[in-house]
Design a protein with these regions (language model features):
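Short pre-active-site segment immediately N-terminal to the catalytic Zn-binding motif
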Residues: 104-120
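Metalloprotease/metallohydrolase-associated module, dominated by Zn2+-dependent proteases
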Residues: 3-99, 141-263, 267
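Active-site recognition of the HExxH zinc-binding catalytic motif
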Residues: 119-132
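Short, solvent-exposed secondary-structure capping/transition elements
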Residues: 114, 129-144
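Glycine-rich, often proline-containing surface loops adjacent to acidic residues and nearby aromatics
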Residues: 100-104, 126
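Short, intrinsically disordered, charge-balanced linker/junction segments flanking boundaries
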Residues: 271-276
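Structural motif marking the loop-to-transmembrane transition
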Residues: 1-8, 114, 118
Length: 276
């Protein structure tokens, strides 16, 4: 890693040392890429992050942008310090912060959701990629993203998610489409697939993981709905029992009142046996 980093520095130094205009221009145009490579080479990649790279099918370039963002897995009690946005469904489980160009990932401990973290890591990697693109590059991608989004139809869950993002920040529509479509949508325009192939050796891996996660959420949602229905049924049963109890109590109270009134009336009971 250190040798590779020094090699990059040496290349830039040689270009400048020669005094050639092309050399200086190369360094200026590739300044961010040089920095990314140096940061990535010096980053001590945790085993978990290395696993995300493999599971999500990232390419060497995708892995570079992920590690250059120095991803950190953050425990739940600390996560809100870095990522504060809310979104429907799964909620926010990661973020790319432009203030320090870093990725923060929520530490998901539920084994049923072990496929989530690679998806979120890839999602945030694409945010890191997006913010490194020029306005011209972003504008060229926007119609492809809108085309892919339009083919999903108005009932697709992504419609609600994007609306929530836009309500929070209207400028977030295209960047979020870029990351979500890249990690969760299987069929995209050929030109867009070719673009994503820069960052994924096999994009179907991350889409498969996303599908698996949403199947888990669908199962959990069904279980919650079943539990809610059972509780509503129990509530109705309890309400029926309460009504029966109150009605029985009312009738009993009326009978007791009538008996007491009759008992206090001389001659109301002709014999002791009738009183008893």
């Amino acid at each position: 890693r250190l040798r590779a980093g020094l090699a990059l520095l040496a290349l830039g130094a040689l270009a400048l040392q020669g005094g050639a205009a092309w050399g200086a221009l190369w360094v200026v145009e590739n300044e961010r890429n040089i920095k990314d490579q140096l940061v990535a080479y010096q980053f001590d990649t945790p085993e978990s992050v290395a696993s995300y790279i493999e599971q999500a099918g990232l390419s060497e370039t995708g892995a570079l942008y992920l590690t250059a963002s120095q991803p950190r897995v953050v425990p739940s009690f600390e996560f809100g310090r870095y990522c504060a946005r809310n979104e429907p469904g799964i909620g926010v489980l990661g973020c790319y912060t432009t203030r320090d160009s870093r990725i923060y990932l929520y530490d998901v401990t539920d084994p049923r959701l072990d496929s989530m973290e690679p998806v979120v890591a890839a999602h945030e990697m694409l945010h890191a990629v997006w913010f490194r693109k020029t306005t011209t590059e972003q504008d060229a991608l926007a119609p492809l993203l809108e085309e892919a989004f339009a083919t999903l139809g108005s009932e697709h869950p992504l419609v609600e998610r994007i609306a929530t993002y836009e309500a929070d920040d209207p400028a977030s529509r295209i960047p979020e489409l870029y990351s979500i479509i890249g990690t969760e949508i299987r069929e995209v325009p050929n030109a867009l697939e070719a673009h994503y192939s820069q960052y994924f050796d096999d994009r179907s891996k991350v889409v498969d993981l996303a599908d698996r996660v949403y199947r888990v959420f669908d199962t959990l949602q069904a279980e919650l709905e079943q539990l809610s229905n059972e509780l509503n049924s129990r509530n109705a049963e309890i309400e029926g029992l309460r009504f029966t109890y109150e009605e029985t109590s009312r009738v009993l109270a009326a009978d007791i009142g009538a008996f007491n009134e009759k008992a206090n009336t001389p001659g109301a009971f002709p014999s002791k046996s009738q009183f008893e």
